């Protein structure tokens, strides 16, 4: 996928496409605590080890510098894969995305954990590569994750994120279709696909996806924001304003609310100059 370009391509997508794609990496799923695998000795974690892992992840998120030092010390004392994963999480929290992604790649390569856990490592590595502006490596790791766990709908979404950021909207839609085939009731995925359809100027298909997302989640602010974009394109500024005002009312202070405010201001400037 050497045709991937940097994040500058996202400047062409002023909507909510892929805004939510990085959330899960901040949540840093407790891979080992959830799966019960990953120990270097017997393939499982004791209750004490699980608690240590959870505490390490929490510190890595809340106080990443302290978390990094703690994770390194745990690793050096024989903490194994869970400690190595915690080191990477701390690096992500510190904004050192390339180093985190490199460590996650190495961890996935060395891991003796079950395929679902390794796929999770690769998915997180892919997200870190995206944040490091390396979409080619992100796509590579996400593809590897899908080879291990092809029936996980979130992994298809993850790869669609990289494809969308690269401006490969048709390929992104293909991956989103596969995710929806596995789980049709994903409002967020319908919204992502609607944004991709909008970028391809397939506005009717985009509106269908947005309306279906709102059937599932009537107050979804991302869906309302996207519908506002579609109304604006159709020249229905009053309806666009209504949706964006709802976004601001229901999620004030969030990035999507800030984007809605900016869109209203731009629309008012254009209207005033006509």
At which residue positions do the language-model features occur?
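N-terminal leader/linker segments that initiate helical-solenoid repeat arrays
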Residues: 28-86, 90-102, 272-274
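Terminal, low-structured helical/coil segments at or just beyond the last alpha-helical repeat
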Residues: 38-39, 44, 239-274
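Helix-start (N-cap) detector for alpha-helical repeat units in TPR-like alpha-solenoids
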Residues: 49, 81-82, 115, 119, ...
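Residue-level recognition of tetratricopeptide repeat
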Residues: 56-57, 89, 127, 161, ...
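Structural signature of tandem alpha-helical TPR/SEL1-like repeats
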Residues: 63-66, 95-102, 132-141, 166-178, ...
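Structural marker of alpha-solenoid helical repeat scaffolds
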Residues: 76-77, 110-114, 148, 182, ...
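Canonical tetratricopeptide repeat
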Residues: 86, 120, 124, 158, ...
């Amino acid at each position: 996928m050497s045709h991937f370009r940097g994040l500058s391509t996202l400047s062409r997508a002023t909507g909510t496409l892929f805004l939510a794609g990085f959330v899960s990496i901040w949540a840093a799923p407790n891979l080992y605590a959830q799966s019960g695998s990953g120990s270097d000795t017997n393939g499982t974690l004791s209750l004490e080890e699980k608690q240590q892992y959870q505490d390490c992840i929490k510190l890595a998120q809340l106080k990443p510098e302290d978390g990094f030092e703690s994770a390194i010390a745990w690793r050096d004392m024989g903490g194994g894969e869970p400690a190595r994963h915690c080191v990477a999480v701390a690096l992500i929290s510190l904004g050192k995305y390339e180093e985190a992604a490199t460590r996650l790649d190495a961890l996935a390569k060395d891991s003796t954990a079950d395929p679902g856990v390794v796929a999770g490592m690769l998915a997180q590595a892919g997200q870190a590569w995206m944040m490091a502006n390396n979409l080619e490596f992100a796509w590579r790791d996400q593809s590897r994750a899908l080879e291990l766990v092809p029936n996980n709908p979130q992994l298809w979404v993850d790869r669609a994120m990289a494809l969308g950021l690269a401006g490969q909207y048709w390929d992104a839609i293909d991956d989103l279709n596969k995710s929806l085939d596995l789980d049709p009731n994903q409002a967020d995925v319908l919204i992502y696909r609607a944004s991709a359809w909008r970028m391809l100027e397939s506005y009717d298909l985009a509106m269908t996806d947005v309306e279906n997302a709102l059937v599932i989640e009537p107050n979804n602010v991302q869906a309302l924001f996207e519908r506002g974009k579609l109304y604006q394109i159709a020249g229905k500024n009053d309806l666009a304003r209504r949706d964006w005002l709802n976004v601001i009312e229901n999620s004030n202070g969030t990035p999507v609310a800030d984007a809605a405010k900016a869109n209203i201001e731009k629309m008012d400037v254009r209207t005033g100059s006509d």
